[in-house]
Every structure is written in C-alpha cells, then in structure tokens.
Design a protein with these regions (language model features):
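Sensor-1/coupling segment of RecA-like P-loop NTPase cores
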Residues: 91-100, 106-112, 119-146
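A generic local structural motif
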Residues: 84-86, 117-122
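P-loop NTPase nucleotide-binding core
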Residues: 1-97, 113, 130
C-alpha cells in the first residue's frame, strides 16, 4: 500500500472488557496513529473530541512513546460519534484509513454484544474513506460473530 494515500491504524482489543473500553482504545489508536507528532494528536483530540480533557503521560525512558487517556463515557460521546472518527480523520488528512482490529472475537464476550455488533456494522458500512480488517485467534468465535 502506498503510505502517501493510505494510513493504517492497528489496535489489539484483547484486554477490552466492555464496549466503552473498546471506544477509548479505538479513539486513542486513531488519534495517535494518524498523527506524526504528539502535537498533531492533541490537535486532533481538540478538533474531534472537544468535550474531553485528555490525560497525556510520558515515560522517563526516552525510547518509550507517550500515552493518552481519554476517559470516554456515554455522558460525553455516543458510540456512533466515536465510530465516525475514522471517517472524519480520513477526510481531514486526505488519506484512506485502514483500521486493523486484532482479537475482534472479544466483542462476543461483552454484555449486549449483539447490539454492539449491529452498531459497528451500522456505522462502518456507510464510511467511504475507511476500510476495516478484523482479526481473531478463536475461529469458532469469529465464525459466530459473522
């Protein structure tokens, strides 16, 4: 893929235990991986997640990256608003975004997972500037989801 026209975003959701754990991890991955500098990630947060006060942490190890905590809850943002972020970011940066989600079968373990799956499909199917790659290590669970 041409990096000038395609931006890949990867997240592993193995440790996500709930729908809003996923939305937080999803939004952080998008903000960090579509920005080439921390300053741009912060600008993206200010533009697209204006109702949040992110917490940014730095590691004393100069090799380590910074981390962002958004604390997204249903009070601040609806699931649909978070799921629309890739499309909004793709338009802003002028690239097609490919979101790769590993351990996708975890969604099947969440409370009300059928509703979450319908919500994801309902939003994602209308996005024109974003593609999704869904990976899972438990074939039977992935088959059940689809």
């Amino acid at each position: 893929m041409n990096p000038d026209i395609v931006q890949t975003v990867y997240l592993d959701i193995y440790d996500c235990r709930s729908e809003y754990d996923f939305y937080n991890k999803f939004a952080v991955a998008l903000m960090k991986q579509t920005a080439n500098k921390m300053e741009l990630a912060i600008e993206n947060i200010k533009q697209f997640l204006v109702r949040l006060s992110p917490k940014i942490s730095f590691s004393p190890d100069p090799v380590s990256d910074y981390s962002i905590s958004l604390g997204i809850t249903p009070k601040e943002y609806s699931p649909e608003e978070i799921l629309e972020l890739p499309e909004l970011l793709a338009k802003r940066i002028g690239k097609h975004i490919v979101v790769c989600i590993d351990e996708f079968q975890q969604i099947g373990e969440w409370q009300d997972s059928i509703t979450v799956q319908k919500r994801l499909r309902g939003v994602w199917q209308h996005q024109q500037h974003v593609s999704y790659c869904l990976f899972g290590s438990k074939q039977h669970m992935m088959t059940h989801l689809f």
